[in-house]
Amino acid sequence: LLGRIVQFLSNVHATHQTIYLSRHGQSEYNFLGKIGGDSGLSLMGEKYAKRLGEYCDNDLSKDQETGEPRPCRLWTSSLQRTILTARHIKHPKIKLDLNGREWTQFSPRVLRNMDEIYAGVCDGMTYEEIEANYPEEFALRRENKLGYRYPRGESYLDVISRLDPLIQELESYQEPVLIVGHQGVLRLIYAYFTGMDRTDACTASIPLNTVIKLTPLTHTCEETREVLYQPTESDLGVNADGGNDAGGGVSPTVTAAARAASFDNPFAMNTEPPSY
């Protein structure tokens, strides 16, 4: 406990920090109502990814008062749906001071500890399939979403444990941080900074196509939400909410082209070994 207190105090600073939370764009599995996996993006997910890149370039990377560039950080998980969502974000170099120190904007950092809750034997299933094949597990999860652990998988409590060192690292930053992540993981980060009870965190609203801006203050946390993409008629047939009510065939995707393009992407050189 003493060590954790010392670590916390060493990360405290007086500067107001801003954290931006974004779910990945709609994935192929979102469209099919499946959980887990490592699928690519649907066409709607790709549209959001492009819009996120524009938002970072035009808004997030600039000081709101002066319009001058401000240094920003970028985190993703190691799963391709977050990496593909962030790949349109530019990485220009900016000058930090008169001494010529440079900063690479949104230098991508890929973190396995940011990966979505692992669903174990239920990975790749819809909730209807889980209820049909594992009715007891389905009931247990409904009774205790926070503590329930998927067979051979994880629980929300497990994810809290692996997020702990990253939360402390976030506390130490003074630059804005954009986290492109997953619903379950972002729920817990959101709950931490807003002071939400962790039991309620399991159902916190982290919608697709939206950036949530959090500014932690002394006794509260300011929050704003900006919807970057509204589904259009061309998205008909796509499950815009990313839930498990989708039907029909697989949404058209851009995954193959994106995978080919990603070999020259800086993300490919910035992975970390698993720690759970």
Cite the ranges covered by each PLM segment.
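GST superfamily/GST-like fold recognition
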Residues: 183-187
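Short glycine-enriched, charge-decorated loop/helix-capping segments at active-site entrances
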Residues: 34-41, 126-127
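Short glycine/proline- and acidic residue-enriched helix-loop micro-motifs
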Residues: 137-155, 241
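Short beta-strand scaffold positions
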Residues: 76-77, 161, 179-181
